C-alpha cells in the first residue's frame, strides 16, 4: 500500500498530549481487538500503540509509516493513519478474514472520545453499510448463543442464532448430545457460525469443553453475564420482533427452554430491542439437526470444503471455490449453506438433481440464465434492509434498483418457460409459478415507481422525483434546465477561444468537488496560463481542471437549484421509500428463489465444464445401498493445471467390504483416494452431479474424519493427543450410516503403541459400529485384520520400484502393499545423496534387528498364506525328491528337474506372497 495514500495527523502540542493521556487511560484489551479512531469527521482514521505496529506490518509492510506522539522514548505512543478507503478494506479484513473485534472511537466536542461503533465477526450491524457499500455480502456472519443443561443424566444443548446482515431470522434448536459434544460441533458447521455467545460461568467443566470445540471450529467466543440468559421478558421481546398477529407462546419453539434462554441472551447482545426497524421484521425457525448430514471440523478440512487463506487466488483448491460460478451474492451464500447442509431426504435430493439435470442438458437455457438474467440481480436482502431503515442517502437509487429487478422478471419467466422436458411440472412448481406470483404482487410497485420517479434522468445517473409530481418541483426543475442550457454554449465559447475541439482535447465535465468545469491535457495547459479569464482549479494526472467566471456562476446556480430540488422532494422520497419498504417480504422471498436458481445453474455449469463431465449419481434410501463408483476423481485436484488425474473405482459393500485399509507409499494417492469418496458423497447429497463415470451411493448421516495434526501444537495439544481426541469423537458419534475417513493414525506415539491403537480402533469400528470406513495407514501389519473380520478389505496404491527409482502409479488396487517406499520417495524429493545413503544403512540395520525381534511384531503374512505356501513347498520338495532320484546325482540333470518343477508350480508360486518373498530372500 503506497505511503502517499496515508493522510497526515496534525495535532498541536496540547491536543497531542491530551490524546496521549486519554489513550493511556483506556483499559487493556485483547490482541484480537483493534481500536480505530475517527479523524476529521470520518475523512480518515488513526490507530495507536500495538494496533499501529500491526497496521504498519500488515497493511503498509514498513515501519516508516509510524509516527510517535507525546514525546520520546517509552512515553511516546506509536501512531499511524489510514485513509477512509484503506480503513474500510482494513475493517473488512479484520472482521471477515482475521475474525478480530473492532472498536471505532468518535470524538464529541474537542476532546471527549467515546466508542461510536462496535463490531465482531458475528455482529456487523454497526459497520455493514461501511464495509459492504461497494461489495455484496458473499458470506453469512452468523452469531449463536448456547447453553448446556442436563436431564436424566443426559447432556442437552440449547442454542439460538441470527444473521443480522443477510437475513431477518431468529433460529432455535435443542438436542441431546454426547460427552464430546459432537452434535454441537456439527451445528456450528451447518450454520457457518462466526461468533458464539456463552455465559461467563468460570469452572464449568462442560463449558470448557464447549469452548475447546469453538476454538477448533475457528469461532470467536463472546462471554456475557449469566443474567443475560434470563427469560423473564422473552415472550414480549420475541413478539415485538415477530410482529402483529404472531404469538411466540403458541409456537412449539417456545417450549424449548434452553433455546429460549439463548434467544434472550442473543437479543440483548445484538441490541435488537433498541432498534425500531427490527420490530415486526423477524421470523422464527426451528433448526432440525437431523435433516442434514453431520460434518465435523476435521471433515470440513479433509474435504477442502471452504477456501483457506493458503489458497490465495487459486479458487479451485476448495469445493466452494470450484462450484461457485454463481452470478449473485445471494447465490454464493446459499451455495455455502448447501455445502454445509447436505440433505438426508432422498425425495429432496432427487428433486434437486432433476433441476440440475434440466440446466445440465439444456445449454441454451443455462447460458441464458447466467449471461442474460442472473448477473443483473442485486442482493435484494441488503436492498430491502436499507429501504426499511429509510435513512440512506441513496434511497431513491435503491428504489430504482428494485424497479429494474421487477421489470426483468417477465424476461426470466419467459426464458424458463421455454423448457418442455420431463421435469416440466417440477420446473413450474419451483420457478415459474413463484415468478408469476412475484410479478403479480410487485406490479403496483412498478406502477408507483413509473408514476413518481424521473426514469429518463436515471439514464444520466440522476435519481429524483418527477418534476410534474409537484408544482414547486416543476418550477425548480424548469429553472435547472434553463441554467443547463447556458452551460454548453459557454463551454463551446471557451473551446473556440483556445482553438481546441470540444470533447477531444478539451473536455466539459462535472464532479462533486468542482461542479461543472473544463479539463485540458497538461501539455496544453500553457494555453490558459497567465490569462485572467481562466481560473485554474486543480492539476491532476488526467490534466488541468479550470473554469471561467461565467461557468462558475452557472455551476453554482445549478448546484443551488439542485439542492433546493432535493429539499423539496425529500418528503416525497420518504413516501416512495416507505411504500417500497412494504414489499420487503416479497423481495426477500424473490431473493431466495433467485439464489436457488443461481446455485442449481452453477452446479450444472461446473458439472458439464469439468475436464471430464460429471454424471448424475443414483442414491438409495437411508439404511440401504452401497458405494459403487466407476472412475471416480477428486473434483478439485483434476482442475489443477499441472495434474493429470488418475481415476479410480470404488466398491464399499455391506457385509463384504465395509472397512477398507489402504496401504502404499507416501505421495502415492492414499489420502486423495479416501478424501474423494467423501467429496463425491457430499456432492451427491447436495443434489449436484459427481465426478464419476457412474455412481451408486447410499445416504450418509455424517462424514467424520481423522486427518493430520494440523496446527494442534500451536494450541498446546500434542500430535498424539489431537489424534486421540478426534478419534474419540468419531467413536462416540459415528453410526451404522456414517462415512468415516481416517488418514493415518498412531504416528504421534511409539510404533508398537501406535499399531496397537490403530488395530483396536479399526477392529471396534469394523465389528461394533460397522460404518463404511476408509483407513489409509503406514502400518502394513494392520492388513492382517482382514483375516479376523470378514468385512475388512485391503487395498493398496500401486507403485513400481527398482534399485534406482520409484514410479507412483496413483492406481488403487485390491491387496496389500508389501514393500516400503519411504527412501524412494525421499529420493524423488531430491534429498541429499549423503542423507539417502545413511537412511539406507540405518534401514538395513533395523531390518536385521526386526529379524531378531520378529516375535514382538504382528506377522507379515496371514496364517492362510503361510499354510498355502508351506503346502506348495511340501509338494515341490516331494516331486523333487521323486524326480531327482532319476537324475543319478548329475548337476545338469538336477537343474533340469528344478526348472521343470518351477514351471509346473509357477502359477501357484506367483499367487502366494509368502513364497515369492522367500524366493527373493534366497
Where are the regions that the model predicts?
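Amphipathic alpha-helices that form helix-helix packing interfaces
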Residues: 349-352, 356-359, 376-387, 402-419, ...
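ATPase nucleotide-binding head domains, primarily ABC-like/P-loop NTPase cores
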Residues: 252, 256, 522-556, 599-922
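Long, charged, glycine-rich C-terminal linkers/tails
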Residues: 107, 116, 122, 278-287, ...
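Conserved phosphate/pyrophosphate-binding and hydrolysis machinery centered on Walker-type P-loop NTPases
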Residues: 13, 80, 84, 256, ...
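N-terminal accessory targeting/assembly segments
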Residues: 28, 466-510, 514
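Basic, polar low-complexity surface loops/patches
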Residues: 1-340, 347-361, 382-389, 451, ...
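A conserved P-loop NTPase coupling/switch region
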Residues: 44-69, 156-162, 169, 182-187, ...
Amino acid at each position: 500500500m503506497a505511503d502517499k495514500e496515508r493522510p497526515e495527523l496534525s495535532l498541536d502540542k496540547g491536543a497531542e498530549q491530551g490524546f496521549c493521556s486519554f489513550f493511556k487511560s483506556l483499559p487493556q484489551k485483547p490482541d484480537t481487538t483493534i481500536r480505530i479512531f475517527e479523524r476529521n469527521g470520518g475523512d480518515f482514521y488513526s490507530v495507536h500503540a500495538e494496533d499501529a505496529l500491526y497496521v504498519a506490518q500488515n497493511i503498509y509492510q514498513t515501519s516508516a509509516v509510524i509516527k510517535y506522539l507525546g514525546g520520546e522514548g517509552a512515553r511516546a505512543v506509536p501512531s499511524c493513519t489510514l485513509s477512509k478507503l484503506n480503513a474500510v478494506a482494513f475493517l473488512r479484513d479484520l472482521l471477515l478474514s482475521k475474525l478480530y473485534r473492532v472498536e471505532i472511537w468518535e470524538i464529541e466536542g474537542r476532546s471527549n472520545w467515546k466508542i461510536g461503533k462496535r463490531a465482531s465477526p458475528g455482529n456487523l450491524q454497526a459497520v455493514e453499510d461501511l464495509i459492504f457499500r461497494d461489495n455484496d455480502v458473499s458470506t453469512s456472519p452468523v452469531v449463536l448463543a448456547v447453553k448446556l443443561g442436563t436431564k436424566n443424566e443426559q447432556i442437552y444443548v440449547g442454542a439460538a442464532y441470527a444473521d443480522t446482515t443477510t437475513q431477518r431470522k431468529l433460529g432455535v434448536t435443542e438436542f441431546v448430545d454426547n460427552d464430546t459434544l459432537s452434535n454441537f460441533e456439527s451445528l456450528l458447521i451447518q450454520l457457518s457460525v462466526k461468533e458464539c455467545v456463552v455465559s461467563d460461568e468460570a469452572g464449568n467443566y462442560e463449558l470448557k469443553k464447549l469452548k475447546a470445540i469453538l476454538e477448533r471450529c475457528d469461532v470467536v467466543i463472546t462471554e456475557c453475564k449469566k443474567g443475560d440468559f434470563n427469560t423473564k421478558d422473552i415472550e414480549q421481546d420475541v413478539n415485538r420482533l415477530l410482529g402483529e398477529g404472531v404469538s411466540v407462546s403458541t409456537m412449539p419453539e417456545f417450549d424449548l427452554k434452553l433455546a429460549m434462554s439463548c434467544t434472550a441472551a442473543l437479543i440483548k447482545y445484538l441490541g435488537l430491542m433498541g432498534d425500531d426497524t427490527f420490530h415486526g421484521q423477524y421470523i422464527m425457525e426451528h433448526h432440525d439437526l437431523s435433516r442434514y448430514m453431520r460434518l465435523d471440523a476435521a471433515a470440513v478440512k479433509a474435504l477442502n470444503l471452504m477456501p483457506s487463506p493458503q489458497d490465495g487466488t487459486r479458487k479451485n483448491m476448495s469445493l466452494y471455490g470450484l462450484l461457485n460460478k454463481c452470478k449473485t451474492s445471494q447465490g454464493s451464500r446459499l451455495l455455502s449453506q448447501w455445502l454445509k447442509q447436505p440433505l438426508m431426504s432422498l425425495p429432496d435430493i432427487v428433486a434437486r438433481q432433476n433441476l440440475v439435470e434440466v440446466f445440465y442438458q439444456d445449454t441454451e437455457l443455462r447460458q441464458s440464465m447466467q449471461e442474460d438474467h442472473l448477473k443483473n440481480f442485486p442482493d435484494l436482502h441488503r436492498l430491502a434492509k436499507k429501504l426499511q431503515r429509510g435513512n440512506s442517502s441513496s434511497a431513491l437509487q435503491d428504489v430504482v434498483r428494485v424497479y429494474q429487478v421487477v421489470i426483468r422478471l417477465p424476461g426470466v419467466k419467459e426464458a424458463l418457460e421455454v423448457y418442455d422436458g420431463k421435469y416440466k411440472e417440477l420446473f413450474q412448481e419451483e420457478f415459474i409459478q413463484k415468478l408469476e406470483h412475484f410479478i403479480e404482487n410487485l406490479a403496483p410497485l412498478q406502477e408507483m415507481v413509473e408514476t413518481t420517479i424521473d426514469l429518463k434522468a436515471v439514464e444520466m445517473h440522476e435519481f429524483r422525483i418527477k418534476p410534474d409530481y409537484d408544482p414547486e418541483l416543476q418550477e425548480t426543475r424548469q429553472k435547472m434546465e434553463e441554467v443547463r442550457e447556458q452551460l454548453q454554449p459557454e463551454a463551446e465559447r471557451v473551446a473556440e477561444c483556445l482553438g481546441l475541439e470540444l470533447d477531444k482535447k478539451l473536455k466539459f465535465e462535472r464532479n462533486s468537488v468542482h461542479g461543472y468545469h473544463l479539463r485540458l491535457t497538461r501539455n496544453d495547459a500553457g494555453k490558459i496560463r497567465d490569462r485572467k479569464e481562466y481560473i485554474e482549479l486543480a492539476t491532476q494526472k488526467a490534466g488541468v481542471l479550470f473554469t471561467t467566471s461565467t461557468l462558475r456562476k452557472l455551476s453554482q446556480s445549478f448546484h443551488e437549484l439542485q439542492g433546493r430540488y432535493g429539499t423539496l422532494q425529500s418528503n416525497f422520497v420518504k413516501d416512495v421509500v416507505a411504500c417500497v419498504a412494504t414489499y420487503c417480504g416479497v423481495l426477500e422471498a424473490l431473493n431466495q428463489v433467485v439464489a436457488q436458481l443461481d446455485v442449481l445453474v452453477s452446479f450444472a455449469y461446473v458439472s458439464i465444464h469439468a475436464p471430464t463431465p460429471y454424471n448424475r449419481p443414483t442414491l438409495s434410501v437411508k439404511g440401504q445401498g452401497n458405494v459403487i463408483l466407476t472412475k471416480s476423481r477428486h473434483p478439485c485436484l483434476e482442475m489443477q493445471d499441472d495434474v493429470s488425474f488418475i481415476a479410480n473405482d470404488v466398491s464399499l459393500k455391506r457385509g463384504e467390504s465395509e472397512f477398507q485399509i489402504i496401504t502404499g507409499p507416501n505421495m502415492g494417492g492414499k489420502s486423495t483416494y479416501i478424501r474423494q469418496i467423501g467429496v463425491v458423497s457430499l456432492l451427491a447429497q447436495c443434489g449436484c452431479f459427481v465426478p464419476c463415470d457412474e455412481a451408486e451411493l447410499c445416504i450418509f448421516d455424517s462424514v467424520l474424519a481423522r486427518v493430520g495434526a494440523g496446527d494442534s501444537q500451536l494450541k498446546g495439544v500434542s500430535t498424539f493427543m489431537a489424534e486421540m481426541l478426534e478419534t474419540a469423537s468419531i467413536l462416540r458419534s459415528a453410526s451404522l450410516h456414517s462415512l468415516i475417513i481416517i488418514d493415518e493414525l498412531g504416528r504421534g506415539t511409539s510404533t508398537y503403541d501406535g499399531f496397537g491403537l490403530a488395530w483396536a480402533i479399526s477392529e471396534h469400528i469394523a465389528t461394533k459400529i460397522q460404518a463404511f470406513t476408509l483407513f489409509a495407514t503406514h502400518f502394513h501389519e494392520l492388513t492382517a485384520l482382514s483375516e479376523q473380520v470378514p468385512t475388512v478389505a485391503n487395498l493398496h496404491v500401486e507403485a513400481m520400484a527398482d534399485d534406482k527409482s520409484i514410479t507412483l502409479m496413483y492406481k488403487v488396487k485390491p491387496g496389500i502393499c508389501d514393500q516400503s517406499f519411504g527412501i524412494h520417495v525421499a529420493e524423488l524429493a531430491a534429498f541429499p545423496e549423503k542423507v539417502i545413503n545413511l537412511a539406507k544403512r540405518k534401514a538395513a540395520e533395523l531390518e536385521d534387528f526386526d529379524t531378531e525381534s520378529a516375535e514382538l511384531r504382528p506377522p507379515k503374512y496371514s496364517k492362510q498364506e503361510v499354510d498355502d505356501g508351506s503346502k506348495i513347498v511340501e509338494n515341490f520338495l516331494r516331486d523333487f525328491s521323486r524326480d531327482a532320484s532319476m537324475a543319478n546325482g548329475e548337476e545338469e540333470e538336477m537343474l533340469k528337474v528344478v526348472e521343470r518343477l518351477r514351471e509346473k508350480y509357477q502359477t501357484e508360486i506367483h499367487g502366494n506372497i509368502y513364497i515369492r518373498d522367500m524366493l527373493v530372500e534366497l
